[in-house]
């Protein structure tokens, strides 16, 4: 598990900055375009800074959804619900794709005290598998944004 932070702020420059620490720069640009196109949330006039806490370099696409939820949280100036975990690959058409080891990710999150999970529908466990954890299965980016 990794923590993803984001800061979104009004840009004073003609070209807003996109800074990604621990994440590929081009991936961030693509995710922001998907957020605009399929989530209806534009950040074209905002500076966007994303940081993976602890200096960890994230290579896998499972971090896509957490990145966009962190951006949304900063943009709204409101934190996600306490003890929320998320994972999922975000496709160019706004679909949330399953990722490898979904079951293991949920087990690990539960052992760390997470009470709410936003996951791809393809990674959703059977109902009641995780007592004490509300697992929200999503197929589209818009659904994930509504769950926040």
Language-model regions, residue ranges each:
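Peripheral, non-AAA+ core regions of ATP-driven protein-machinery
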Residues: 1-148
């Amino acid at each position: 598990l990794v923590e993803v932070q984001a800061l979104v702020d009004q840009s004073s420059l003609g070209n807003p900055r996109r800074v990604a620490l621990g994440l590929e720069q081009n991936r961030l640009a693509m995710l922001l375009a998907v957020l605009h196109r399929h989530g209806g949330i534009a950040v074209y006039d905002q500076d966007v800074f994303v940081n993976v806490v602890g200096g960890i370099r994230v290579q896998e696409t499972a971090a896509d959804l957490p990145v966009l939820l962190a951006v949304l949280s900063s943009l709204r100036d409101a934190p996600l619900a306490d003890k929320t975990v998320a994972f999922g690959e975000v496709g160019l058409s706004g679909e949330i794709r399953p990722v490898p080891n979904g079951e293991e990710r949920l087990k690990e999150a539960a052992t760390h005290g997470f009470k709410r999970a936003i996951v791809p529908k393809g990674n959703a466990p059977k109902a009641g598998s995780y007592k004490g954890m509300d697992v929200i299965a999503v197929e589209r980016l818009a659904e994930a944004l509504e769950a926040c």
